[in-house]
Curated annotation (Swiss-Prot):
Name of the protein this chain belongs to: Hyccin 2
Subcellular location: Cytoplasm, Cytosol; Cell membrane
Keyword match Membrane: yes
Residues modified as Phosphothreonine: T30, T306
Gene from which this protein is expressed: Hycc2
Native source species: Mus musculus
Length: 530
């Protein structure tokens, strides 16, 4: 220790002793201006054989027991260095040199656990909300809470837990040593935002040394001070990590990362679960680069939450979400399928859905289940709409109108029956050699890949159906419906749709057939067999 540093410490000791009580506040406001005092006090504390160590410890205790908060914080900044010297001397069994530091630590502990009246303090801790990020979780991974009455009641609810009562201690023992030291570190962390940079450096050095002393990793360090293995407590290491985490983001990035690795190293050797959990969470949440420390006196902890695994989708994949996705897809395909079905009906009217399916070529792929479902939905919607229209007409019409309506429907059905014709796909029908046109009764229609009607049926008005087929030179085939009338199911439905509403134009027998008024027809290729 240099003579100048010794002189600074002696001046500080004598100055406070002669200070009256009325000037304590002004003295506390100017104490931080003495730049040479703090480094000199660190050197006195580190040297256990220095004769100024005992008066310095006594002076620090007097500052801490004063009513001025800034004087308490001045003493707290040396707490990490005092703990390191105490543990080092405890391992070396130098009880004589350790007495004054032990008394100072016990004095601070006993002052903090009791209030002004001498009653034990009950410390309260507020549980943080999970909606805010931390080193353990991201709020995005938590599902949104339902807006219920119970959730609204707990919106402003603050959860507070209380600590147990801490008994007073007169001496250090192996059983209560880390109970006292952990509580002292808790007091230090509660005021860490007011500590200078020198205190953060002392905290990081203390954490690294107590973790690797006596282990092979000690030889990798720059400091060569020999020390035995120091017994540690998991709770003390967690409090140490709390202070180190703040120091890392406030100017001690390199030292903080070094002590973090040393704490993980010691926790793995000791199999301490709590320090491992906190230290690994801290390490996985660190940014790649050091935080911006350009602003002096910032004193703000910047928490950069970086997940260890790639981010997953915020919406959980559940059975309900898959079902909703399938419904949306089927709805979109249903709209497309509805447009395609309308186009198909315009080009090839008179076909039923079953007929169009059965008339596809063998090389084409049948429609999917979703398309069949969409066509089924369109047909169901049409039938439901037809029923509603028919009920509305039936409720509005009088008995006389109902009779006229029945006659109109019967007349229109006869018209549609008479207007059905079959036009061949080819203009020429070729018959095999040596065969003649068979009789009408023995003629059979073979369904081919071009078009067919599997949903058609025969409607016979009395007697046996007789069909006459004529094959001309131009290949035009007409089906004369005399006693038998052949028409498809879709033809009946479209006739019903076309004439169910009011104000529709009646199809007169002599009027020419247009695209809107003609009866639906379909193409069919005829192949005769014997």
């Amino acid at each position: 220790m240099l003579g100048s540093e010794r002189a600074v410490v002696e001046e500080w000791l004598s100055e406070f002793k002669a200070l009256p009580d009325t000037q304590i506040t002004s003295y506390a406001a100017t104490l931080h201006r003495k730049k040479a005092l703090v480094p000199a006090l660190y050197k006195v504390i580190q040297d256990s054989n220095n004769e100024l160590l005992e008066p310095v410890c006594h002076q620090l205790f007097e500052l801490y027991r004063s009513s001025e908060v800034r004087l308490k914080r001045f003493t707290l900044q040396f707490l990490p260095e005092l703990i390191w010297v105490y543990l080092r001397l405890t391992v070396s069994r130098d009880r004589q040199s350790n007495g004054c530091i032990e008394a100072l630590l016990l004095g601070i502990y006993n002052l903090e656990i009791a209030d002004k009246d001498g009653n034990n303090k009950v410390l309260s801790f507020t549980i943080p909300s999970l909606s805010k990020p931390s080193i353990y979780h991201e709020p995005s991974t938590i599902g949104s809470m339902a807006l219920t009455e119970g959730a609204l009641c707990q919106h402003d609810l603050i959860r507070v837990v209380y600590s147990d009562l801490h008994p007073q201690r007169e001496t250090f023992t192996a059983q209560n040593r880390f109970e006292v030291l952990s509580f002292l570190m808790l007091c230090y962390n509660s005021a860490i935002v007011y500590m200078p940079a020198s205190s953060y450096q002392s905290l990081c050095r203390m954490g690294s040394r107590v973790c690797v002393s006596g282990f092979p990793r000690q030889h990798e360090k720059q400091w060569k001070e020999l020390c035995g293995r120091i017994v540690l407590d998991p709770e003390f290491m967690v409090q140490l990590l709390t202070g180190v985490y703040y120091a890392m983001y406030n100017g001690q990035w390199d030292l903080g990362q070094e002590v973090l690795d040393d704490i993980i190293y010691r926790a793995q050797l000791e199999l301490f679960s709590q320090p491992l959990l906190v230290a690994n969470a801290m390490k996985n949440s660190l940014p790649f680069d050091a935080p911006d420390s350009s602003q002096e006196g910032q004193k703000v902890l910047k928490v950069e939450v970086t997940p260890t695994v790639p981010r997953i989708s915020r919406t959980a994949i559940t059975t309900a979400s898959i079902r909703r996705h399938r419904w949306r897809r089927e709805g979109a395909e249903g709209l497309n399928g509805g447009e395609e079905s309308l186009n198909m009906n315009d080009a090839d009217e008179g076909f039923s859905s079953g007929a169009s399916l059965s008339s596809q070529p063998h090389g084409t792929k049948p429609p999917s289940s979703s398309q069949r479902g969409s066509l089924r939905k369109v047909a169901t919607g049409r039938s439901a709409k037809d029923k509603e229209t028919a009920l509305a007409i039936k409720s509005n019409e009088s008995p006389r109108d109902s009779v006229v309506g029945k006659q109109f429907v019967q007349q229109q059905a006869d018209l549609s029956i008479d207007s059905v014709e079959l036009t061949p796909m080819k203009k020429h029908l070729s018959l095999p050699a040596g065969q003649v046109v068979p009789k009408t009764n023995s003629l059979s229609l073979i369904r081919t890949a071009s078009a067919s009607s599997s949903k058609s049926f025969d409607y016979v008005n009395g007697g046996q159906a007789s069909t006459s087929i004529g094959v001309g030179t131009e290949g035009v085939t007409n089906l004369a419906a005399t006693n038998a009338n052949r028409y498809s199911t879709i033809s009946l439905q479209e006739d019903r749709l076309g004439h169910a509403g009011e104000g529709k134009e009646l199809l007169s027998p002599g009027a020419p057939l247009t695209k809107q008024s003609r009866s639906p027809s379909f193409n069919m290729q005829l192949i005769s067999q014997v």
